[in-house]
Regions:
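Helix-rich, well-folded core regions that mediate interactions or catalysis
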Residues: 1-233
Length: 233
């Protein structure tokens, strides 16, 4: 059982693309549509998530992430997923690029599709400078935001990543604490990091969203500086 093939592409879009009106994710409806055996995949993913860092997410965000990973797992088992790029872009809204690669690697290792293995290696090369960071470095939120922003830019949905972060209610207190320990400079230049930090401390959660979005929108060089490891600083 599961989703009829005729509705597969529609369901994928509804699950993995952000709703430009409210970014709403109907977990119960999506789980129902996914089929009777879906809970087995959810249980498997919950075990694997034990090794993944997602400290910024609330319980609601963790539920979304669990569902998406389980659905990807189910699709890969059925050999209906051949392009990991779009999936990686969506997952980077929830977890850092390093963690995205880690979880996709776990999933792909179970696949007998050589094409998918090659695809994963290409993805690793693309995300290479992210993957190279320290495994315990949680201050990846802004780099995740930048990557997601760039991936959605062509579709005119730049603001929706911002809305999604707000809906998930990231733990910004923890995020700022990590930034104060200089971890943010691993991700972006310090002259961009400082204004974001102070904007948050003064105005709170809404302020950091305004600051991040403003920086990205008005500084093309900021985006360019994050496009390669050599240009980070």
């Amino acid at each position: 059982m599961g989703i009829p093939e005729s509705k597969k592409s529609i369901f994928l879009r509804s699950v993995f693309e952000l709703n430009k009106n409210n970014c709403h994710f109907d977990y119960l409806a999506a789980k129902k549509d996914a089929g009777v055996g879906f809970m087995e995949y959810t249980e498997q993913i919950n075990i694997e998530l034990a090794s993944i860092h997602y400290d910024f997410l609330t319980d609601f965000g963790k539920k979304e992430l669990t569902f998406m990973l389980a659905y990807i797992h189910q699709m890969m088992e059925a050999k209906r997923v051949s392009n990991l790029g779009p999936l990686a872009s969506i997952l980077m809204i929830y977890i850092s690029p390093e963690e995205v690669f880690k979880i996709l690697k776990l999933l792909v290792e179970r696949s007998d599709k050589i094409k998918m293995r090659d695809n994963l290696m290409h993805l690793r090369n693309k995300l290479g400078w992210h993957v190279a960071t320290d495994e315990d470095d949680h201050a990846q939120l802004i780099s995740t935001f930048i990557d997601s922003y760039i991936s959605l830019k062509k579709n005119g949905n730049r603001r929706q990543v911002l809305v999604k972060f707000y809906e998930l209610q990231y733990n910004f207190d923890f995020f700022v604490h990590q930034m104060m320990n200089s971890l943010l400079t691993v991700v972006i230049p310090i002259d961009f990091a400082i204004p974001v930090i102070f904007n948050y401390l003064i105005e709170g959660q809404k302020g950091i969203f305004k600051s991040m979005y403003g920086l990205i929108k008005s500084n093309k060089q900021f985006i360019v500086s994050l496009s390669s490891k050599d240009q980070l600083m």
